[in-house]
C-alpha cells in the first residue's frame, strides 16, 4: 500500500473533516432492523417522520393516495434541498482549504484582517503564558538578539513582542534603495535592487523562518515566534512578568528591551491644526515609506525638514525622482550645510552642493517658527522671516527613545543622552538587558553613549543575546554607520564623529570605482556592515615619521575620496571614510588602540586612498 507524504499528507489532513458517510458500512450486528436505515444515512428528523406518516394512516389504517403523493413529494423536495445545501457547503469549505494550503502566514493574516474589516471574525491569537526568552520590540536589535540566542542555545524558545504589524525588517533601504527601484509594485513587494543588480527583500527572514506563538512552548527544538501588533505596557522586573495591551500576561526568565525610538516632531507642527498634522510624515516605518511614495506621485511639492542622515537621504531620493516627475523638493535645516553636526564645515558645504545637483532646493540656516495653511498650501514661516509654501512636510529631526517601561519596571533613564541606562554588558538588571536605539551604554573606550544606527542595533542586539545566554561580554566592538547620497557619493563612519571636535582630513582624487555602487558590487550587499571582516585588521603597523602639519582642505576642492579623523586629547576617537569602502576594520583597530599619532597623513596611508 502506498503512503502519502509531504504535500499529500497536508491535503489529507486538511480534507479529512470534509468526508461524509454517504455510504453505510455493513453493520457488525446482522440482526439490526432495517428501520434504522434513515438514522444511519443521517436523514433529517422531519424527513424520517414524513416517511413514517406515509407508511401508515390514523389508527394504523391506509392513507388516501393524494395525501400520500403530497407527503412523498414534499419529502423528496426537502431531501433534495438538504442534499444541495450540504454539497455546496462542503464544496465551499473544500475550496477554502485547498487555497489555504498554499498561503503564507503573512497572507493568511492579511486575509483574516480583511475578513474582520468586512464584518468577519478573527480568531484570537493564543499568547503563551511563559517563555524562557522574551524580546520586547521587533526591530533590528531584537532580531539580532534572537539569532544570537539561538546560535548559542539551539533549543531556545524566543518570543518577540512587536508593536509593528510587520515581521522584523531592516530600515536603511526605506530611505535609500527602495526609492531608486523601477518596479511599480515596490511598495507591495518591498524588494529592492542593490547597486550590484542583486534583488533583496527588506525582511530579515521569510515568514517560514518563524514558528507560531501558540506553538512555541510545545516545539521540541524551540524556535523564534513573533507577536505582531502587540505592545508591552507593564514590566514587573521582580516578578519576571509583562502585561500586554490586550490584557495578556507573560512570565519570562530573561528579557531584552529593544523598543527603539519614535521620530521627533517639531513644536511648531505640534502647535498647528489637524490639517497640518495630517499632511506631515514622521518617517520611520514601512507604512511611512508606502504613504510618502504615494504622496510623491500626487502632490507638486514636498519639504523635508532636517539636514542629518535621514533628511539628506530622503531629499536626494525625492530629488532624483523629481527629475522625471517634476515635483519640487525642498530641504531646510538650522545648520550651515548638510550633515553639519557630523561633517567638518568644508565637507558639509561640499555635500550641500552635491544635494542641490540631485534636484533639491536646499535652505540652510532655517529655523521653523510656525506652520499653517494658506490657500490650500502649507505655509512654513522661518525665524528670519522667510516663507516656504509646500504641499507636504517630512520631518527627519532625530528619535526620542521609547522608555515608557522604565516607570513600571523601576529602570534608570540617562539624564544626558536619554534611553535606558545600562552597564558595559548592556544589563539594566540581573535578568533585563537593553539594546539598540533605547540603550544608553558604557563604551569601555569612548565612555557613555547612545547610538541610533543600523549596525549598532545589530552589534548591541547580538551582544545582548550572547550575554542573555551567559557570555558576560562587555561592549567593545565599535559599530559603524553609513550614508549614501545616491549611487555616486557615500561615506562610512565609526566612533565619535562630531563636527565640534578637532578634525584632520586627508583626501585624494577619486576614480570611477570610488562610489557606493562599486562598493556594493564588490561586497555583494548594500548593507555594507554585513561585508565587514575583523580579521583584516587584526594587526596594523603605522610606520614612524617626522611630525608634520596636516594639510587643511581648501574650500571648493573636489573631495573625491578621503579620510577624516576626529580627535579628543590628540587621540583618534572617530573616523569618516569618504567614498572609501571596505576599510572599516582598519578604522576600528585605530580607535581601539587609542594611541596618539604625530602624523595623521601616515595613518591615512593605511586606507590606500592614493591608489588608483
Curated annotation (Swiss-Prot):
Its main location: mitochondrion. Residues 1-53 form a transit peptide. Keywords: Acetylation, Apoptosis, Cytoplasm, DNA-binding, FAD, Flavoprotein, Isopeptide bond, Membrane, Mitochondrion, Mitochondrion inner membrane, NAD, Nucleus, Oxidoreductase, Phosphoprotein, Transit peptide, Ubl conjugation. There is a cross-link at residue 254 (Glycyl lysine isopeptide (Lys-Gly) (interchain with G-Cter in ubiquitin)). This is Apoptosis-inducing factor 1, mitochondrial. It is found in: Mitochondrion intermembrane space; Mitochondrion inner membrane; Cytoplasm; Nucleus. Residues 512-551 are annotated as: Disordered. A motif (Nuclear localization signal) lies at residues 445-450.
Amino acid at each position: 500500500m502506498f503512503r502519502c507524504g509531504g504535500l499529500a499528507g497536508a491535503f489529507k489532513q486538511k480534507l479529512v473533516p470534509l468526508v461524509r458517510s454517504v455510504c453505510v458500512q455493513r453493520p457488525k450486528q446482522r440482526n439490526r432492523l432495517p428501520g434504522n436505515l434513515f438514522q444511519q444515512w443521517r436523514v433529517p428528523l422531519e424527513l424520517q417522520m414524513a416517511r413514517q406518516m406515509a407508511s401508515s394512516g390514523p389508527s394504523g389504517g391506509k392513507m388516501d393516495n393524494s395525501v400520500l403523493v403530497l407527503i412523498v413529494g414534499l419529502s423528496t423536495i426537502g431531501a433534495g434541498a438538504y442534499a444541495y445545501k450540504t454539497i455546496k457547503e462542503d464544496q465551499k469549505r473544500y475550496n477554502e482549504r485547498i487555497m489555504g494550503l498554499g498561503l503564507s502566514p503573512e497572507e493568511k493574516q492579511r486575509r483574516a484582517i480583511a475578513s474582520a474589516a468586512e464584518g468577519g471574525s478573527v480568531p484570537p491569537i493564543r499568547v503563551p503564558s511563559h517563555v524562557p526568552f522574551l524580546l520586547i520590540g521587533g526591530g533590528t536589535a531584537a532580531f539580532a538578539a534572537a539569532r544570537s540566542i539561538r546560535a548559542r542555545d539551539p533549543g531556545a524558545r524566543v518570543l518577540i513582542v512587536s508593536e509593528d504589524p510587520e515581521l522584523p525588517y531592516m530600515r536603511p533601504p526605506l530611505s535609500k534603495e527602495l526609492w531608486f527601484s523601477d518596479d511599480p509594485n515596490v511598495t507591495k513587494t518591498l524588494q529592492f535592487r542593490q547597486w550590484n543588480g542583486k534583488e533583496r527583500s527588506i525582511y530579515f527572514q521569510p515568514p517560514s523562518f518563524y514558528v507560531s506563538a501558540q506553538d512555541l512552548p510545545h516545539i521540541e527544538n524551540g524556535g523564534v515566534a513573533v507577536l505582531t501588533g502587540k505592545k508591552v505596557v507593564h514590566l514587573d522586573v521582580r516578578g519576571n512578568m509583562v502585561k500586554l495591551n490586550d490584557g495578556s500576561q507573560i512570565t519570562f526568565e530573561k528579557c531584552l528591551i529593544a523598543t527603539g525610538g519614535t521620530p521627533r516632531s517639531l513644536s511648531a507642527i505640534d502647535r498647528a491644526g489637524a490639517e497640518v498634522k495630517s499632511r506631515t510624515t514622521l518617517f520611520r516605518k514601512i507604512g511611512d515609506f508606502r504613504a510618502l511614495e504615494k504622496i510623491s506621485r500626487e502632490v507638486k511639492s514636498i519639504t523635508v525638514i532636517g539636514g542629518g542622515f535621514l533628511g539628506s537621504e530622503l531629499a536626494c531620493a525625492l530629488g532624483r525622482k523629481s527629475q522625471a516627475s517634476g515635483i519640487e523638493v525642498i530641504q531646510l535645516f538650522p545648520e550651515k550645510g548638510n550633515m553639519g553636526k557630523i561633517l567638518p564645515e568644508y565637507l558639509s558645504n561640499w555635500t550641500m552642493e552635491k544635494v542641490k545637483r540631485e534636484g533639491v532646493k536646499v535652505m540652510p540656516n532655517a529655523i521653523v517658527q510656525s506652520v499653517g495653511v494658506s490657500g490650500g498650501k502649507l505655509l512654513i514661516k522661518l525665524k528670519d522671516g522667510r516663507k516656504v509654501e509646500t504641499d507636504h512636510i517630512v520631518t527627519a529631526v532625530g528619535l526620542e527613545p521609547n522608555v515608557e517601561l522604565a516607570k513600571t519596571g523601576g529602570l534608570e533613564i540617562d539624564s544626558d543622552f536619554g534611553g535606558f541606562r545600562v552597564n558595559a554588558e548592556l544589563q539594566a538588571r540581573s535578568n533585563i538587558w537593553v539594546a539598540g536605539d533605547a540603550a544608553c551604554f558604557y563604551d569601555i573606550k569612548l565612555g557613555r553613549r547612545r547610538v541610533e544606527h543600523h549596525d549598532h542595533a545589530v552589534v548591541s542586539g547580538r551582544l545582548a543575546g550572547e550575554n542573555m545566554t551567559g557570555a558576560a561580554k562587555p561592549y567593545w566592538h565599535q559599530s559603524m554607520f553609513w550614508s549614501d547620497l545616491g549611487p555616486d557619493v557615500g561615506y562610512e563612519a565609526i566612533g565619535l564623529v562630531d563636527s565640534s571636535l578637532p578634525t584632520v582630513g586627508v583626501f585624494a582624487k577619486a576614480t570611477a570605482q570610488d562610489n557606493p555602487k562599486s562598493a556594493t558590487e564588490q561586497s555583494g550587499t548594500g548593507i555594507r556592515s554585513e561585508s565587514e571582516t575583523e580579521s583584516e585588521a587584526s594587526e596594523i603597523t603605522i610606520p614612524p615619521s617626522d611630525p608634520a602639519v596636516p594639510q587643511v582642505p581648501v574650500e571648493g576642492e573636489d573631495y573625491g575620496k578621503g579620510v577624516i579623523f576626529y580627535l579628543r586629547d590628540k587621540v583618534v576617537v572617530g573616523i569618516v571614510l569618504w567614498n572609501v569602502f571596505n576599510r572599516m576594520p582598519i578604522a576600528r583597530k585605530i580607535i581601539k588602540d587609542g594611541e596618539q599619532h604625530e602624523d595623521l597623513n601616515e595613518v591615512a596611508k593605511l586606507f590606500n586612498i592614493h591608489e588608483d
